[in-house]
């Protein structure tokens, strides 16, 4: 499968899952984006069109993180989970954004679950 087909497949899955799982204030959407070297995660309220929280491996507090990409992803998941629990959010809808539930995406989800998020 070539690069163009992979991108088209991911876009198709992304739009299908976005239509299915809408985030609200009580149960926001945990949206993951993964680039080759970084990982980004946001809590999105689709009803009001607002970003409630966001954490990435590029943010100032995470600039000096050492370890493998999976270890960093697990740390990012724990951080978003802890911040969400502090705001009173415990239930979320997990949006893997068309990426396979494997590797860094799975590590981020495991870290968020360890911090207390339910999905």
UniProtKB/Swiss-Prot annotation:
GO BP annotations, alphabetical order: translation
A cellular component term, taken from the record's GO annotations: cytosolic large ribosomal subunit
Region described as Disordered: spans on this chain: 1-22
Spans traversing the lipid bilayer: none
Bias (Basic residues) ranges: 8-19
InterPro entries documented for this protein: Ribosomal_uL18_bac-type, Ribosomal_uL18_bac/euk
GO molecular function ontology, one term from the record: structural constituent of ribosome
Database matches in CDD domains: Ribosomal_L18_L5e
Keywords: Ribonucleoprotein, Ribosomal protein, RNA-binding, rRNA-binding
Domain of life: Bacteria
Stated role: This is one of the proteins that bind and probably mediate the attachment of the 5S RNA into the large ribosomal subunit, where it forms part of the central protuberance.
NCBIfam families, per database record: L18_bact
Quaternary organization: Part of the 50S ribosomal subunit; part of the 5S rRNA/L5/L18/L25 subcomplex. Contacts the 5S and 23S rRNAs.
Family that this chain belongs to: Belongs to the universal ribosomal protein uL18 family.
Name the record gives this protein: Large ribosomal subunit protein uL18
Gene assigned in the entry: rplR
